[in-house]
Regions:
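Transmembrane alpha-helical segments in multi-pass inner-membrane proteins
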Residues: 266-272, 278-346
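Structural signal for alpha-helical transmembrane segments and their membrane-water exit/capping regions
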Residues: 40-69, 180-181, 228-235
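Short loop segments and helix-boundary regions at transmembrane helix junctions
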Residues: 22-32, 52, 95-104, 127-191, ...
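Single transmembrane alpha-helix segments in multi-pass membrane proteins
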Residues: 45-53, 62-122, 137-163, 249, ...
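Helix-loop-helix "hairpin" substructures at the membrane interface of multi-pass membrane proteins
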Residues: 146, 209-286, 310-311, 315
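Hydrophobic core segments of alpha-helical transmembrane domains in multi-pass membrane transport
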Residues: 33-50, 87-91, 112-118, 140-145, ...
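Cytosolic-side transmembrane-helix boundaries in multi-pass membrane proteins
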Residues: 1-40, 46-47, 245, 252-259, ...
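Transmembrane helix-bundle core of multi-pass membrane transporters
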Residues: 162-233, 286, 367, 371-373
Length: 374
């Protein structure tokens, strides 16, 4: 006697139940795909190490030791993560509206230089240190906002590609900073390395709660939360997502796309400028060529790995900061150049770019609850 099988026992029924048991694709894809990209990057880099007769196990063990194994290494990783959080936000916010800005490095450099310059006439004037620091922060953020806002204005008013314009503006910013540091604002005492006049000890913000981590980490955390709220819980953020998804539709709905572009670029520039302030007031104590160390470009990797989510930028920045912090240990123990970490970051970046093609294409991730396709 034949018996009819229940719908749930058929392959299609099992597949439907599996789909229903999965979280929504919009929640699971941004987690699984970047993690898979990181794993693939680690495998590719392991092949690279084996080709150099180096042990992948030793390398990743040293990365753990240099970035997470002790309180000292954790502080080192957090200190390097602080500017990455801010520059990651500087890329992530414009990306939410569909803009690809590469100008965080230039905004960071000019922001840090502006903070150092405005502090020069106020040092020794008797003004409270908190007031001077506030002016420095405002100057750095304003300079960064203006500089990256210029790329947004060129895009809106003249149709200039924002990726090209922001990248060119970065090189212009570095050239301007070099001229000012080596020329009118050079400290006569800086013989070997041209720098501005050093900041006084009351204007240094290098220790947070008695640790070696500077206050830039706290600033980055606060901004990440605030910008997450703005981009996900406000009408501005909703309108920005609409414009980022379909610019013509947003314009057809009468949304002020141009003003939103300028606002996102200004916010991004403010974040990068703030990173420049902390580089001056917490790390170097003056503006010099060390401001242009690549944090602005590393922020692109952070934002990509975080899928332009302001909150996700924080843990990703800590991960990349740990990689940077362990570079010296890898160099000493494995006799490899410090640029090895840049190779790994480049592999991660390329893998992330390739992984973007898988969004919406994996059958087991492209269903919402109930079995409807996304």
């Amino acid at each position: 006697m034949s018996s009819e099988s229940s719908p749930d026992s058929t392959p299609d029924g099992l597949e439907a139940r599996l789909r229903q048991s999965l979280p929504e694709a919009r929640l699971i894809e941004p987690v699984i795909i970047p993690l898979a990209a990181l794993l693939v990057s680690a495998l590719i880099f392991s092949v690279f190490l084996l080709a150099l007769s180096k042990s992948p196990a030793t390398f990743f063990s040293l990365v753990w030791t240099g970035g997470f194994s002790s309180w000292f290494s954790i502080q080192n990783a957090l200190q390097r993560a602080a500017p990455l959080i801010l520059t990651g936000l500087a890329f992530a916010i414009p990306a939410r509206i569909g803009l690809t800005l590469l100008g965080a490095e230039g905004a960071l450099v000019l922001g840090g230089l502006s903070a150092a310059i405005v502090a020069l006439p106020m040092q020794g004037s008797g003004l409270p240190a908190l007031m001077i620091l506030t002016v420095m922060v405002l100057a750095a953020m304003a300079m960064g906002a203006v500089w990256m806002g210029l790329a947004g204005w060129l895009k809106h008013a003249r149709g200039v590609n924002e990726t090209i314009s922001s990248l060119l503006l970065t090189y212009i910013a570095i050239a301007i900073a070099s001229f000012l540091i080596e020329g009118p604002f050079r400290d006569p005492g800086s013989a070997n390395k041209p720098s501005t006049q050093p900041l006084g000890p009351d204007l240094r913000v290098g220790e947070m709660f008695g640790t070696s981590v500077h206050w830039g980490l706290a600033g980055g955390l606060v901004l990440a939360v605030v910008l997450w709220v703005v981009m996900t819980r406000t009408s501005f953020g909703f309108a920005a997502r609409i414009a980022g998804g379909n610019l013509r539709a947003a314009q057809g709905q009468g949304l002020p796309v141009g003003r939103m572009m300028l606002a996102c670029c200004a916010i991004a520039g403010g974040c990068a400028g703030l990173a420049g302030f902390f580089e001056v007031a917490a790390i170097h104590g003056q503006a010099n060529a060390s401001l242009a160390t690549g944090y602005g470009f590393a922020g692109i990797l952070v934002a990509f790995l975080a899928r332009q989510n302001p909150l996700a930028v924080v843990p990703v920045a800590i991960l990349i900061g740990a990689l940077d912090a362990s570079g010296g240990l890898v160099q000493r123990r494995m006799e490899m150049p410090d640029a090895t970490m840049l190779v790994l970051q480049g592999i991660i970046f390329l893998t992330l770019l390739i992984s973007d093609t898988f969004y919406g294409r994996l059958p087991f991730l492209t269903y919402h609850r109930g079995g409807d396709r996304t």
